Amino acid sequence: MSSKRAKAKTTKKRPQRATSNVFAMFDQSQIQEFKEAFNMIDQNRDGFIDKEDLHDMLASLGKNPTDEYLEGMMSEAPGPINFTMFLTMFGEKLNGTDPEDVIRNAFACFDEEASGFIHEDHLRELLTTMGDRFTDEEVDEMYREAPIDKKGNFNYVEFTRILKHGAKDKDD
């Protein structure tokens, strides 16, 4: 009996506590949102995000990512990407980053050419069909003062600057 207790005590010392620190970085609602995002990306529902999951997710958004692009994304992780690793990676990215960078990088996820622009129709589709969905009225409100050129390209770099620092006066 005492040998079983000794084994139990040794077993208790083995679990790594690093994962619990990751979960402590976020409140429950944030963790739930990350879980929803993870599940949206984990297309084959195997509990891991792999290159095929990323490809399928981007293809569902109308993108045709190259293997090189996908490999670059996968190389961000030191190993298989389960939910804990996903949360850890976001924790590292969000820890100490400027909110302006976070907002700009969120838009950049959908800018495959890294041009700083997303076509307004495509952005509307994304905002009204993914995550915390916007209504068409909310998108219209956002577009009222948004930097959109004559070709319908939404300048998310400038928009992020406006969100953070305010709009420039039109009289200047």
Swiss-Prot record:
UniProt-annotated stretches for the region Disordered: 1-20
Q: Where is the EF-hand domain?
A: 29-64, 98-133, 134-169
Q: Any idea where this protein resides? A: Cytoplasm, Cytoskeleton; Cytoplasm, Cell cortex
- Membrane-spanning residues: none
The question of whether Ubl conjugation is a record keyword is answered with: no
Specify whether Acetylation is a keyword of the entry.
yes
**Annotated binding of Ca(2+), by residue:** 42, 44, 46, 53
Main localisation, per the record? Answer: cytoplasm
Q: Where is the composition biased (Basic residues)?
A: 1-16
Q: Which residues carry this modification: Phosphothreonine?
A: 19
In which tissues has expression of this protein been reported?
Answer: Smooth muscle tissues and in some, but not all, nonmuscle cells.
This entry's Gene Ontology molecular function terms read: calcium ion binding; myosin heavy chain binding; structural constituent of cytoskeleton; structural constituent of muscle
> What's the PTM story here?
Phosphorylation increases the actin-activated myosin ATPase activity and thereby regulates the contractile activity. It is required to generate the driving force in the migration of the cells but not necessary for localization of myosin-2 at the leading edge. Phosphorylation is required for myotube formation. Phosphorylated by DAPK3; DAPK3-mediated phosphorylation is inhibited by LUZP1.
**Residues found modified as Phosphoserine:** 20
Tell me the Pfam families matching this sequence. EF-hand_7
Sorted alphabetically, the Gene Ontology BP terms of this entry are:
myofibril assembly; platelet aggregation; regulation of muscle contraction; stress fiber assembly
Keywords (alphabetical) are: Acetylation, Calcium, Cytoplasm, Cytoskeleton, Metal-binding, Motor protein, Muscle protein, Myosin, Phosphoprotein, Repeat
InterPro entries xrefs: EF-hand-dom_pair, EF_Hand_1_Ca_BS, EF_hand_dom, Myosin_RLC
Please give the GO cellular component terms listed in this UniProt entry: cell cortex; cytoplasm; cytosol; muscle myosin complex; myofibril; myosin II complex; stress fiber; Z disc
- Per the record, residues carrying N-acetylserine are 2
CDD domains the UniProt entry points to: EFh (cd00051)
What SMART domains would the database entry show?
A: EFh (SM00054)
Q: What else is known?
A: This chain binds calcium.
Task: Summarize subunit and interaction data from the UniProt record for this chain.
Answer: Myosin is a hexamer of 2 heavy chains and 4 light chains: interacts with myosin heavy chain MYO19. Interacts with LUZP1; the interaction results in inhibition of phosphorylation of MYL9 by DAPK3.
- Disease / disorder: Megacystis-microcolon-intestinal hypoperistalsis syndrome 4: A form of megacystis-microcolon-intestinal hypoperistalsis syndrome, a congenital visceral myopathy primarily affecting females, and characterized by loss of smooth muscle contraction in the bladder and intestine. Affected individuals present at birth with functional obstruction of intestine, microcolon, dilation of bladder, and secondary hydronephrosis. The majority of cases have a fatal outcome due to malnutrition and sepsis, followed by multiorgan failure. MMIHS4 inheritance is autosomal recessive.
Question: Per its record, how is this protein called by name?
Answer: Myosin regulatory light polypeptide 9
Organism the protein comes from: Homo sapiens
